Design a protein with these regions (language model features):
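N-terminal secretory signal peptides that target proteins for export/translocation
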Residues: 1-12
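Vicinal oxygen chelate
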Residues: 31-38, 41-52, 77-78, 95-181, 202-212, 216-221, ...
Length: 292
């Protein structure tokens, strides 16, 4: 540009506004925990144990459509979906999710047929038929029934089980939907999560459930007490909290003994705490993931 060229102030302002609006509209510029302002406690993350990080990145990114983000000064890589983050730790899992207290995690998707076709093309096993009752007709890995949901189940690396539920009305192509426990004490679990994390008690698919702003906590049946999550492929589940320190103090007053008490980690821009619920679910509480 010629140094003597004058810039029209009005055009300069329009250009500036264009850049700002483009940034705000960019998916990479938006926080992934969209529901962070809708409640004191929301769902935050799944934490995966695996010896094959690349296999899980392929599953969560290519298979399910997540995106990569970075956390804190260490720029730790995180896989992001609307209303849930996925953390990967290099460690040998003791088992998959089936047979543990948390049987699977669930997402809603606007196009289950495209998702299942993509997952099958990538070589992942669709286990829908074995997971659904005979009232569902299953074709090409997708289950349907009259007046019911269109759903599918996929088995990912290290035998992590994921459910997909079609919902064409959601705001994103895919987003967090539910955590599905398997327990002989579903009603007790519902009451416990209502008291300690503020989940609103109700039912989902006829099973005891609790609702938080961005996740349903579904407490499905099991005839026996199942394995704890810590050390398995889904090592723990995570809830994002406003004023975590205060909540930890409240939980301690209610008798919760923390596996790892409240601590702040400036390099990650986080505060965290860990406890295990009475049925063996390893739970992390965080404050700061809503900035990703």
């Amino acid at each position: 540009m010629n140094p003597s060229t004058k810039i029209n102030p009005f055009l300069a302002l329009l250009f500036h506004l264009f850049l700002v609006s483009s940034f705000l509209a960019s998916p990479s510029a938006l926080a992934q925990l969209y529901s962070a302002d809708k409640g004191r406690v929301i769902y935050g993350h799944h934490h995966i144990n695996t010896q094959n990080l690349d296999a899980h990145k392929r599953f969560w990114l290519e298979g399910l459509g997540g995106e990569t983000r970075e956390l804190g000064e260490t720029r730790r890589e995180v896989i992001a979906f609307p209303d849930v983050l996925v953390f990967l730790t290099e460690a040998s899992p003791t088992s998959g999710t089936r047979g543990t207290i948390v049987n699977h995690v669930g997402f809603e998707t606007t196009d289950i047929y495209a998702d299942v076709a993509r997952l099958q093309a990538l070589g992942y096993a669709m286990i829908t038929r074995e997971e659904l009752p005979e009232t569902y007709e299953v074709i090409d890995g997708i289950g349907q029934r009259v007046a019911g949901n269109t759903i599918a189940y996929v088995l990912g690396p290290d035998d992590i089980k994921v459910e997909l539920i079609e919902n064409k009305e959601i705001a994103h192509n895919i987003q967090m939907h539910h955590i599905h426990w398997a327990s002989e004490a579903g009603e007790d679990m519902r009451a416990w999560y209502a008291e300690h994390l503020g989940a609103i008690s109700g039912l989902r698919i006829g099973q005891p459930a609790g609702q938080l702003p961005n996740v349903n906590l579904t407490f499905g049946p099991s005839e026996t007490r199942l394995a704890r999550t810590q050390g398995t492929v889904l090592d723990h589940i995570g809830f994002e909290v406003k004023d975590l320190k205060a909540l930890c103090e409240e939980l301690e007053a209610k008798g919760i003994v923390f596996d790892r008490p409240y601590v702040e980690i400036p390099a990650l821009g986080l505060a965290i705490a860990f406890f295990t619920d009475p049925w063996g679910t390893y739970v992390e509480l965080t404050e700061g993931l809503d900035s990703i």
